[in-house]
Structures are given as C-alpha cells and as structure tokens.
Swiss-Prot record:
Positions annotated to bind ATP: G38, E39, N40, G41, A42, G43, K44, S45
Listed name of the protein: Ribose import ATP-binding protein RbsA 2
Described function: Part of the ABC transporter complex RbsABC involved in ribose import. Responsible for energy coupling to the transport system.
GO MF annotation, one: ABC-type D-ribose transporter activity
Species name: Agrobacterium fabrum (strain C58 / ATCC 33970) (Agrobacterium tumefaciens (strain C58))
Catalytic activity: D-ribose(out) + ATP + H2O = D-ribose(in) + ADP + phosphate + H(+)
EC numbers on record: 7.5.2.7
Membrane topology recorded in Swiss-Prot or TrEMBL: Peripheral membrane protein
GO-annotated cellular components: plasma membrane
Family indicated by similarity: Belongs to the ABC transporter superfamily. Ribose importer (TC 3.A.1.2.1) family.
Quaternary structure annotation from Swiss-Prot or TrEMBL: The complex is composed of an ATP-binding protein (RbsA), two transmembrane proteins (RbsC) and a solute-binding protein (RbsB).
Ranges where the ABC transporter domain occurs: 6-241, 254-499
Keywords, sorted A to Z: ATP-binding, Cell inner membrane, Cell membrane, Membrane, Nucleotide-binding, Repeat, Sugar transport, Translocase, Transport
Principal place of residence: membrane
C-alpha cells in the first residue's frame, strides 16, 4: 500500500432538503492516478468542490498527510498544493494564453510592469509538454480543444501535490489525449496524486491505478483497477445490471432505401469542400474524424448556421432554398450543438422555456402570447419520453446534471418534430446511464423514420450506434464504412490513407 496523502471519511453535505453527500469517502495515495466514477448527480462534483475549498462539508473528517485540515477556499487549496482543472472552460478570452496561465502573478504583481517576455517563455515551456500553442495568442481565439489544453497547462504551473482532472479529454483529439496521459504518468512518477474524473471506461482502465465508485452521494467501493471489470464498475455506478449500452441495430430487411436527405456540392469558405452524401429514412449516419476535421462544419453548413455555404440540399426529393437556420428548422432539419451551454441552452431559464424555444408557434395563442399551460405540458411530455430527472419542468436548467441538461437540449430539438437531426457530440460529459438512454432515444427516433446524423469523437460510440459511418478529414468526406467493415481499425486506416495521399500529392 502506498503512502496516503489525502483521506476523506464520512463526508456529509446538504443543500436545503437535498442531501448531496451521505457518508462519502475517498483515500488518495501519493503518486497514483485515482479514478472517481459515478453517474451525474452521484456527488463527485460536490466532493471535489470540498477538496478544492469551493464548498465546506457539513460533517466528516479530512486528513492531509495524516493531519486534520480545513480547506476554506480555492486559494487555500492552492496553497496546500491542490490544483483543479474544471470540466467547463474558465479562461479569460480577452487576454493572452500566458496571462491566463499565470493570472495570479499578473494580478498580484506590485511593480508597474510585468516581464511578459519571461511570462511567455515560461508558458511556452509548459505548453510544449502538452500541445503546440503560441502563448502570445488571445485565449478567445483558440478552439475548444486548445482552450482545454491551456486549462490543463494552467494547473500544471501550480506546485501541485494533488491534481484534480474533471473530464480532461472530453474536447481533446486522440493525439492530444495520449500526450496528456504521458504527462499524467510523469507527474505521478514525481509523487503527484491525480484524481481522474471521466465517463470513459477505456481511459480509466488503461491509465488509472485505482478507482472509487460513488452513487447517490455515498461511497460504494474502492478497488485496484486490476481487481475489477468495467461491467462491475458500471453496475456499481447505477445500482443495477445495466442493459446494453447500444440498442440493437436494424436488420437488413428493416432498412429503408428511401433517401430523405441528399447533399451535393456543399462548400463553405475554407472549411467545407465538395461534400456529397445521402441520408436514408430511419438511418443513423455517423461522422468520424479528428477534432477540427470539419465534421461539425459540414452539419452547420447544411443547416445554414454560419457562413454562406454553396451547394444543393434536397429533402424528400425537393430542393430547398435555405437562407438561414430558421428556414432549416421550418423544413424540419435541426442541429444539436456540441456546446450545449454556449449555444444550446438558456441555463438560467426553465426547462419548459428551453424546450419550447424553437417552436413558439405551437404554444402561442392567436394573438402571439405564450400559453404557459401548453408550454409546461409539452415540456413534461418530452421530459417523460427522455426520462428527464427533474423536480419540475419549471426548474432552471442550471440546476440539472450534465446528462439531464443534454436531455433538455435533445427535447428542444424534438419539439419541432424534425425529419432530419444532426447530433454533435450528443453524449459528451454524460454518465453511462444517461448515455445508454440517449443511445436508446437516438435509435427510437430512427425507428420513427427520422434521419439522424451523429458526430462523435468516441469511435466505439459511433460504431455502436451508427448504421453507416462517413470519415471526414480537412472538410472533405474521404471514406465510408458499414457492416463488418465498421471497425476502429478500418476507420483509422481510412484517415491514415488520406494523410499519406495528401503527403504524396504535396
């Protein structure tokens, strides 16, 4: 057994009548990578916020190096050597990468001038270990994945003894994720203890040493990774034997040959080039490719969400004249954004208001006034259909777990009864139970005749849920796989062939 650096026992925390933690516990050893698993709402975030000093426990004991400690604030946590990389990006967009990484120094400097050249040099040294990002760039100009890398680099600038990583690979490419895992191992070899929160079982079992499972605010079990299986972890998380993560696919004789959506010659600026594809009625079509390959850009161009794309979009044999996204919605083609909190949901508004946002006409009277009873009823119907967990559809979306927020975003799309729906990273940051439910709903939509396009960075998910997968690279569709050919190896091979072809042509 390794040296215990942090011990938390019998931790309790309540918010009014809601008991978020009940006898929670965690033991962290020096130099280990310790996974923390549980469904959204299990209490993981509350427990981590107590370690980070954001919240104070109502009861229980916290020992650091065997001594009782009270972590009164995030600054106190930093002084104790505790760093936290949150799932949601919290960079200041208007200043440089280097200034974000060393914000505490720039804010506390007593001199009139900061040595920004030195700051940038130090930032570049840290960033070289993670990703090739210019420390002088404005943070707001970076992609989501690049901003996530900066968040991780920012935490590494602290003299950490304990590092908390909350879904750190959610927006990273496979290459970036593998780089992060190497850095985690180097940090662990230096004696830093890492708490790794993720819903991705493959990552947990490949890179973590031990795992603690939480459910309903309680500690369920802590095991060595070698002594437990992914199935046992999932069953401990949900408190039951979970049905298959992916619902059965359609048999060949159940598939339709009717093309519901046909896209030809789609071009948009310098991001989408000569894209052609067909989507059949009741089909789930996957878009595979690395982050930045152009998968989202293709979907957004079809829906007229940005730029001025050229090309033909044909729905059920009828060529559409789409000027903007409102036209797309009216025609029954909708897009669920990968950034549900940025442009998918109104967090401070009610569930009902969010669900009805795309279809105000359905719940308005003849004079244009919203009929709240209709709004609530419609939201309640869709909430039950998606097994939304909330006290009331009048609750603010911000009070929900990540998985339930995603269900609200999906309900918002379903409210317009679409014929085609693009789902961009539909299960990102969602726990395994909610993931299985979303997969079931996607298949149910397809069975009702809706054409579904799923964009996901998780190849197992794409393969598990899709009937057919298109490979996208540099804004172009470069390959197609289905049936027995739909394997991770084949998809990656297609991407590699494209890379080699591009190199040869250059």
């Amino acid at each position: 057994m390794g040296e215990v650096i942090l011990s938390m026992t019998n931790i309790h925390k309540a918010f009014g009548p809601v008991r978020a933690l009940r006898s929670a516990a965690l033991e962290l050893q020096r130099g280990e990578i310790h996974a923390l698993a549980g469904e959204n709402g299990a209490g993981k975030s509350t427990l981590m916020h107590i370690i980070d000093g954001i919240l104070q426990p109502d009861g229980g004991e916290i020992l650091l190096d065997g001594k009782p400690v009270r972590i009164s604030s995030p600054n106190a946590a930093n002084r104790l050597g505790i760093g936290f990389v949150h799932q949601e990006i919290a960079l200041c967009p208007e200043i440089s990468v280097a200034e974000n990484m060393y914000m505490s120094e720039t804010g506390q400097s007593r001199s009139w001038f900061m040595n920004y050249r030195d700051l940038e040099k130090r930032a570049a040294t840290v960033l070289r270990e993670i990703g090739d990002i210019d420390p002088t760039h404005r943070a707001g100009d970076l992609s989501i994945s690049q901003q996530q890398i900066v968040e991780i680099a920012k935490a590494l600038t602290l003299d950490c003894r304990i590092l908390i990583l909350d879904e750190p690979t959610a927006a990273l490419t496979e290459t970036e994720a593998q780089t992060l895992f190497k850095i985690m191992r180097r940090l662990a070899a230096r004696g830093i203890a890492i708490i790794y929160i993720s819903h991705r079982m493959a990552e947990i079992f490949e890179h973590c040493d031990r795992i603690t499972v939480m459910r309903d605010g309680c500690h369920i079990r802590t095991e060595n990774i070698a002594d437990i299986s992914p199935e046992e972890v999932v069953n401990s998380m949900v408190g039951r034997v979970l049905d298959k993560l992916y619902p059965p696919k359609l048999a060949d004789d159940e598939k339709s040959n009717e093309v519901i959506l046909s896209v030809r010659g789609l071009n948009e600026g310098k991001r989408v080039f000569d894209v052609d594809f067909d989507l059949r009625r009741g089909e789930i079509l996957g878009f595979a490719g690395l982050i930045g390959a152009g998968r989202s850009e293709i979907a957004r161009a079809v829906c007229r969400l940005e730029g001025k794309p050229k090309g033909e979009v044909v729905l059920r044999g009828r060529s559409l004249k789409l000027r903007d996204y409102r036209d797309s919605i009216r025609e029954g083609i909708v897009y669920l954004s990968e950034d549900r909190k940025g442009d998918g949901l109104f967090l401070n508004m009610s569930i009902a208001t969010n669900v009805s946002a795309l279809d105000i006409g359905r719940i308005s009277n003849g004079m244009g006034f919203i009929q709240r009873r209709k709004e609530m009823k419609r939201a309640d119907e869709l909430g039950r259909r998606l097994k939304l967990r909330a006290n009331s559809v009048g609750d603010a979306v911000s009070t929900l777990s990540g998985g339930n927020q995603q269900k609200v975003a999906l309900a918002k799309m379903l409210s317009v009864e679409p014929e085609v729906i693009f789902l961009d990273e539909p299960t990102r940051g969602v726990d395994v139970g909610a993931k299985a439910e979303i997969h079931r709903q996607i298949r149910e939509l397809a069975r009702q005749g809706v054409g579904v396009v799923v964009i996901s960075s998780e190849l197992p998910e794409l393969i598990g849920v899709s009937d057919r997968v298109l490979v996208v690279r540099e804004g172009r569709i470069t390959g197609e796989v289905e049936g027995d050919d739909m394997t991770e190896e084949k998809i990656m091979q297609l991407a590699s062939i494209t890379i080699m072809q591009n190199a040869a042509e250059a």
